[in-house]
Amino acid sequence: VMWILDGYTVTDRYPLSQRESLETMTDDSLQDSGGFQTLPTDEINYLRNSVKVTVDAYDGTVTLYEWDESDPILKAWQGVFPDAVEPRSEIPAEVMVHLRYPEDMFKAQRYQFQRYHVTNASEWFEGSSRWEVPQDPQNDKKLQPPYRLFSDVGSGDTWSLTSVYVPRNK
């Protein structure tokens, strides 16, 4: 039995990029709010799912696997700790079939897409075409979580995340 976790590289110092609260971007009615206490700052402007982590449930062995091979922050850490992260090619096939797109990454991207989906400059500056993730009908203080879908798309079973947007302030 293995636990699989997603490892992220984050910073608040990426040039020419707006900072946002990670908690705000990932908060919804299903989110446990205790996970952000280990971050030195909640505001980030760079987020990559750079590492997949496995934890052996029997003996506690932790293995880090490089997932995003082009991440410069991960490359810097690998320069300091060269043996800490295994190459992506070393991920066992029986683990690879269980890897999923990270939900927190999806939530951060959907948060940004609310504003940055607009391609017309005047509409972007006016904010007239902005979207928002709707509130959860069962908890009006929290956002609706993404839908988790498992379906057969012809080429086999597929797991996916999807989300709904509504026009902002309408």
What positions do the PLM features span?
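Accessory, solvent-exposed terminal regions and/or long lumenal/extracellular loops of proteins
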Residues: 73-170
